[in-house]
């Protein structure tokens, strides 16, 4: 990614302090279990280690570390029974979910040969789960429980931990980067309008405003011909260009991409929402004609770029890129009632990482429908198979909400006039899907990603403390 971020996960373990002097062998046992557990956390996150906690004071010290680090998530390993005062001081002042990991060392007891310290050390992690949740509820803390076993490995536990860490990375990306708004939303698309201060207060995402005049001149000082040539080749490697492509043909586009990449790094931008509604002449027309593929090159590198000035879909694109590896702007395009499928897609910039069915294409059109000027269109080709859609919307009080659905992309004819589009079948049927999706009140844009990701999106929503409408899965 052009702007790298790394989630910060607070990790600690708890045990009842009264057990340790009674059964001293529990000390090395718990130290070994905790060390092994920390190794299960993916290296994509920064671990803030609160240690093994057996007293209120140790719990408070862990909480101080978590607050100082501004953790995105807390993961708590339950080693054996423990009282909730070992946990609550560590999380009392945090506004992030607490994931309780109840992993038992042994798959099953050896009933006849199990003594008290063996039971406490290897078989009793489940003892306090309910107590912890009860007190997290009373403290108003969001929470989740993962139950499993250490012996023999437990892929389900590992998958859940990885999922939560992916979700935490979304929070860190929103907090540590910025959104660039260039111009303003498409006139009259009031579903896209947004209060940027409310956005920052509720979703931690700061908006930087940029004028088009700065964008027109952004490449004026780009003179490194080797960098431009390398980027031109990158463009040719990314797209099949109608009529053939050469380095010379995409030279100016490559200059802009080099400039935009530097701008993204300098301004720490992970989201772009842009729309130009002026005259497509001179330098304005030049950039406007090649902006779609130029921004597609940014999307490829992790910066979500949304057309029509849609900040909310830029966020949805970034979420899916972070958790699923791709994020493609889409909208309801058409319905094939004969086949009972929805045609979903959009014009404009897209994500090459979703285009695994074939290489993305680029062609020149004389007019961008509904917009100023003409120029290069890009079309991406999502594969047949599972697909997830995510939209972000708001209620009348400004609270955000996620709207999600899972479906399956099917083979068959698609539109070929230059816009990305796919044939999606939903379990509830096309007619019912459109009714349910629309009634949820999303913006008319959504983001798409290959695979099924609702479970991860639910974790992202838990971290952001926003509701989710699950339309179908």
PLM regions with names:
Residues 71-80, 99-101, 269-275:
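Periplasmic-binding protein-like
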Residues 370-473:
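Extended hydrophobic packing segments that form well-structured cores
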Residues 59-71, 88-90, 257-266:
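Short, well-structured alpha-helical segments in soluble
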Residues 296-416:
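C-terminal catalytic subdomain
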């Amino acid at each position: 990614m052009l702007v790298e971020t790394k989630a910060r996960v607070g990790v600690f373990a708890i045990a009842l302090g009264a057990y340790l002097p009674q059964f001293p062998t529990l000390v090395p046992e718990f130290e070994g279990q905790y060390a092994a557990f920390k190794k299960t956390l993916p290296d994509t996150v920064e671990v803030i280690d609160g240690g093994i906690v057996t007293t209120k004071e140790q719990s408070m010290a862990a909480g101080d570390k978590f607050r100082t680090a501004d953790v995105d998530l807390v993961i708590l390993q339950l080693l054996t029974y423990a009282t909730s005062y070992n946990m609550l001081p560590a999380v009392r002042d945090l506004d992030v979910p607490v994931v309780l990991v109840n992993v038992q060392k042994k798959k099953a007891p050896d009933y006849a040969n199990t003594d008290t310290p063996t039971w406490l050390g290897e078989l009793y992690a489940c003892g306090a789960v309910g107590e912890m949740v009860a007190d997290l509820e009373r403290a108003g803390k969001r929470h989740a429980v993962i139950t499993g076993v250490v012996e023999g490995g437990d892929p389900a536990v590992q998958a859940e931990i990885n999922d939560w860490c992916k979700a935490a990375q979304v929070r860190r990306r929103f907090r540590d980067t910025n959104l660039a708004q260039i111009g303003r939303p498409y006139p009259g698309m009031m579903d896209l309008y947004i209060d940027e201060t409310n956005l920052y207060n509720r979703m931690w995402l700061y908006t930087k405003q940029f004028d088009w005049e700065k964008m027109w001149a952004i490449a004026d000082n780009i003179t490194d011909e080797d960098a431009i040539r390398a980027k031109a080749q990158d463009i040719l490697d990314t797209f099949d260009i109608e009529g053939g492509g050469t380095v010379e043909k995409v030279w100016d586009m490559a200059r802009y991409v080099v400039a935009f990449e530097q701008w993204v790094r300098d301004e720490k931008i992970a989201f772009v929402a842009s729309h130009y509604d002026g005259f497509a002449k001179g330098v304005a027309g030049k950039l406007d004609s090649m902006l779609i593929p130029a921004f597609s090159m940014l999307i490829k590198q992790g910066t979500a770029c949304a057309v029509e000035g849609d900040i909310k879909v830029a966020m949805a694109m970034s979420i899916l890129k972070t958790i699923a590896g791709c994020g493609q702007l889409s909208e309801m395009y058409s319905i094939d009632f004969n086949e009972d499928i929805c045609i979903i897609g959009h014009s404009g910039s897209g994500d090459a990482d979703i285009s695994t069915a074939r290489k993305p294409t680029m062609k020149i059109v004389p007019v961008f429908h509904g917009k100023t000027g003409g120029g290069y269109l890009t079309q991406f080709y999502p594969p047949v198979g599972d697909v997830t859609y995510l939209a972000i919307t708001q209620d009348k009080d400004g609270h955000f909400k996620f709207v999600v659905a899972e479906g399956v992309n099917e083979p068959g004819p698609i539109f070929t006039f230059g816009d990305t589009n796919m044939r999606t079948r939903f379990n509830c049927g096309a007619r019912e899907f459109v009714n349910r999706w629309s009634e949820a009140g999303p913006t008319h844009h959504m983001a798409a990603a290959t695979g099924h990701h609702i479970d991860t999106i639910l974790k992202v929503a838990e971290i952001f403390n926003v509701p989710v409408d699950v339309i179908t899965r």
